[in-house]
Structure formats: C-alpha cells, structure tokens
C-alpha cells in the first residue's frame, strides 16, 4: 500500500498548487481513484467495530481552541484490550481515507453556515482575538479547507501527537494499581519527542473603546467585551466571581435584576478564559414591547447594562450579594463532584491548562479566601478598562458554501482482520453484572394520586426536589406562558414580594427553583441546602399559591408576550426550527404542536395575568409525583412536604405521557419544503411502527444498533464513512414511554442540496434491501449488554427512573430481563424485525433545501 499512500500525499501537494477549477476536479478524481485502491488494505470502520466489540459506547472526538480530545466509555473488564487498541491507533497511523473525512468536514462546515449564531460568534471573536489563532473559527477558513495538504497533517501528527503532549484520563470502576502496569505496557511504547516552541501571539489591543456593528443576528443583541485573563491567572477565579455578581444560576445578579424587572429580555456575563488569553463578556438582548412589536434600542440596552457594570467598577458591591454568590459557588462545586463525567472534565482542564489537580480541588477554599477588596480591585482593573462593543442587528449573513467534488464511495474489505484476531487473543476480565437496586427508595402516598419518593444522598448536603404534575401543554396550551411567568414573578400580598426579592430570599437559604413544562407534565424543580429544606419548600409553595403576575403597566406579561413574539419571528428564519415544524406537520398533520399551540396575534398577545394564573392553579388539581433526593431521613422529609406543600386531596388522574394523534402513513409520499438560502439540505424518513411491547425491547435495541448504531451502523457506514455524503445521518425506532403506545422509525441525512437524490437512493436501498452482515452479531450482543448494564441513573434521577419503569410494567430493573434476552439474540432476530417492521412498509420522505441544486 505504501506507494499508493505516497501518491495520495503527493496529489494533495499538487491540488494545493492548482487554481484552475477543471484541473482541480481532475486531481480530486485522481485522489479518489487512488484512495479507493488504498481502501482495500484496511476497513475504514474497523476501529469503531473493534470499540463496539469490547462493549464501547459514545465513540467521538472534538477539537476546541486549546485541545483535541478522543473519548468513549467501555466496561472496565476490557481495560487491557481498550488500552491496546488506543495505543496501537496512535502508532504509525495511515490516513488513507483522508479525502472521505475531508468531505465530511465540508458537510460540517456547510451545516454551521445555516445558523446565524455561527456568523455572529465568528464576527465577534474575530475582532476580540484579532491577531491570535483564537480569532479563527475552530473548523478553519474556507480556503484552508479547499486546499488541504495531507503532508502537513502528517507533520502535525508527528509533532504534537506524542506522549509528552498527551493525557490519558480514566474515570470509573477499575483498580488503579493493576491498571498502571497495563498503561505502561501499551502506551509506554509511544516515543516522546521534543515539542517545538508554541507560537507566541501579541495581546489584542484594548487601548481605547471601540464599536462594531453587523446585521447578522436573528434578533438584536448587544455584546460588551473587556480584556480578560488566561486560564490559571491569579485573577481568573476572582473574575469568575465578578461575572457571577452580574448573573448566576440563582438569578440574583445585577443583570438578573434587570431581566426580573422587565427591562431586558435576557442578560448574562461570562469569563471566557483560554490557554493564552481571555475576555470578559456581557451579552444582552433588548426588551421587546409586545404592543408595538418593537425592541427597545441597543443604546438604551447598553445604558442599562453599563449602569450595573459601573456599580462594580465603583466598588458599590452589596456584601449580602457577595455571600450569596459565594454559597452558590460551593454548591455548584459539590454538584460537579457528584458525577464521573464532571470529574473527567476536571482532569481534562487540569491537563489542558497545566493546572495542578490539587489546586482545582481547592476551589471552595480559594473562593472562601476572596475578599471584598479583591472583588473591587479586579472589577475596577478589568471592567473599568477600555472595551469593545458589538451591536448585532437582525440580518441575513453571507454564506460562503464549500463545493464538494463528485467522488465514488470507498469499498473496504469485509471479514476479520489479523489485528482483530490479535485483539481478541488478549485476555479480558470477567463481566460481573450489577443491577439498579431500588430498595433504598422510600415510596409512599399522601393521597390517591399524590405519591412521594425519597432517595438518600450520601455525597453532600444539597437536596433536590421535583414536583411533577400530570398535565402539560397538550391539555393546557397556555401553561407554557404561565411557566414562563412563574420564572419571572414575585408573590402577592401587602406589600408582597418582588421577583428579585423572592429569588434573593431563596438564595439566602441556599435555595433556587425553576418552572418548566412539556407536552404532558408541569415541573417545579427546587434545590438547596438540606438544613433549610423546610423554609425553602414553604417559600416556593407560597409562590405557587399566590404568584403575582400583575405589574406596573403590565410590564411583566408584556415581557413574556414580547419573548414569544420574538421567538416566533426567529422561528421563521431558523432552518433547524422550520425543519422541526415541517417534520411535526408531516407526522401529526393538524395535531402538530406548532399548529395546536396558541396563535400569536389572536391568543398570545391577548393573554391576561388572571387568565394565566387560572391556568396555573388548574395544574394543582392533577396527579402529582414528588421526587426528593437528600440526606434527611425519609420520615422527616415527608412530614415537611405534607405540612408545607398545599396538596389537593382529590386530584384528577393524569393522561400523560401524551400520545399525540399521528397522520397514518399508508402510501409512499414525498414532501418538499424549498429554501434557497440553505447551504445544506435536510432529509427525513418516516415509517409507522407498531404499538410498543416491552417484550420486544431487545429486538428494538438490536435493530437500532445494527441499522443506525453510531459509526458501526449501516446508515453512518454507507452514507458517511463510504460516500462522505453527510456529517450527520441516523435511523432508529423510538420506543414509547408506555406500553401500547405507537413506535415510529425516524431517519435523517443532512447533505448538500445537489447530493440529495444520491443520498435518498442510498438510504432507500438500506430500507428496501437491508445489507446482511450476520458476523456483526457478537459485537452487537456485547455492546447492548454493556449498554443496559451501564444505563444507571444518578441518585437524583433514581426515583424518576423507577416511575418510568413502572409505566412500562417493570417491577425490577429492566436490565435483569434484557441481559437474558440479549444473550439469546441472533441475526435472525434483527432480520425478522426488519422484515416485519421496515421492509415494504410505506414511507414518508421530507426534503428541505435549495430546489435549484
């Protein structure tokens, strides 16, 4: 293969020097021919198949401004095989399928172009980090992507992909001391090399105030930016604290007050820190007057924001606010340490920014040491300095589409490679299944239809409490707006409690709450210090019973109306939302949630505070689930909840989870939604499913894994890996949350508009005549077994997993039954499922994109 590989490298050198379009196309076609020859020496999907074969899931990678990361989860008993596979992957890699992957990057680039937010972000960061690599979008400039050099990629790999510039981060249920020798045995063979000196960039000048304007956004937006600090700087944590004085998750910051006072639609502060440099950002969206359907000016928005920023610069900082923010830091750190994935992120940051792990673990101690003088000094030093202001107006950005050459698919060899046999010969540990033990959940009932579940928290003293009412927007369409009002309202009374005061009172107790709604449920989520559970619950209950939706000049409800009006207008220009609405129309017809929701002019803009308060009170007449996770004894918790919550003794039974009526698919049908502005077309495939039966759960899983299971599934393999037609492609059957509810097959391909016909041909060939690879079943059994065994909730979600299982009729962890069924799986199960539920079934196809291509 080596001569072919060297030829591919040389051809890319030629392509980079060729400017004539016809000549370039000829070179690309020649690259494709040689790449197809080289593809015979190794399967492009072998790595993903090997990961699947050891039970690995979530195979992916990402590139940020400062680091590239490769990751997946896997069972610890396969540790040696996983270490061997990854270490071998990094030893003399051959980039034979470079052209195919580059095509996928083109698709990714074009996909981002259809989102105005991409253009806004690129414009702002291009100015904020001018002169630095941070000014460039991560995916790169179009010219770089059009003229890639494989030789430069290989040089980059040889320079930076060395063990002295690399971290291996493992978090999970394994023995550290027995794993260390395995790491030495596998990764120890990688050769260190001296690293070149990193490019030193000058700091972007912030010598005077500067102002920029651009018509790129979905709505007007103000961005104010100051020069900040790099990660690890002595002022980094204090600047983070200053940002939280402006906005935070408790909604008690100075900018939060502006939104709660209905002066702004949205405002947030953030400390953007990176390896070399950083910026301090304030983002605000103007208030929209629902009566005139106009935003307040960006000038007025800037005046409001800068008045609050100036308070910090002048040292006008409320000591009480400082202590509330400090307590919130403590809570958020403790919550972070609850989850393995967050520990991965912590270690990832420690490596990327060369920070001692011990220092990161001392965050609470370091936050405790921040003084008022520190805050005043840092606020004045950074926020009192020159700034860059960005006025983003509504507009349509120019899109520089990347053209793709017409290339033929790569056909890789099938069957087991020698490497696969080698990996299989490495001894694996023994799988010891563990299942979810629900016995520690205290289950009780206050009244018929009012259930309470208490789960112990042994990690910290932060409780979480969810009130889940059995009604949502499907039955009460205005409930969406009542929930929005609850998140911005205070409490009735004489004199009553204003919205900001209500949030501050909760924060003093270490508490916070939020309200949300779905098709079928209304949620009240409460969190806080365990010692103040009773007071926090009492305060939230008071808010639930006596919310104050009235305001001077109806500013509060007009704010909500303005948000809805603005959101509806954004929907018309956001291709992702338009596609979602089109999909729902194809699926549900006149029952689409976009059609059934309250009409903007006739209903939303006519809403009254009393009307929405009435809707909110209807919620409390429905079936209720109470989910508590905390450290207090269940008996004490139930006593607090029973006495402090206003519970209805006679509730209406829930009809949720909602099953929205669908449009039956009785014949093949294609829907077109033309949009000439789109760089990438969206293609959906829909097939009606059968009523869900949990006895078929494993068959659904097996088909989904075989047909659409990540990089190893047929869809990604045929459409992305072989043909480079799409960055995103999938296909799966969704399982219903309740026995007997309908399932459905949903497929998707995002591709250039001129590739739509080809992509549909390939996808339809998979649906009409599914390729059969029985040899993949061992991998599928392995990954499904690992998937069901590792699909465990956090302690905070444990009781909700229990009730979800109960809806499906399970009395134990479903994995206990599914592991047995997985062991019996054969390819006949997959084939039978396909023939009964897919083959020959009528299909609806939805195409959204530029019709001219």
Give residue ranges: language-model regions.
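Proteolytic maturation boundary segments
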Residues: 175-214, 221, 251, 256, ...
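Proteins synthesized as precursors that undergo proteolytic processing into mature forms
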Residues: 240, 480-484, 701
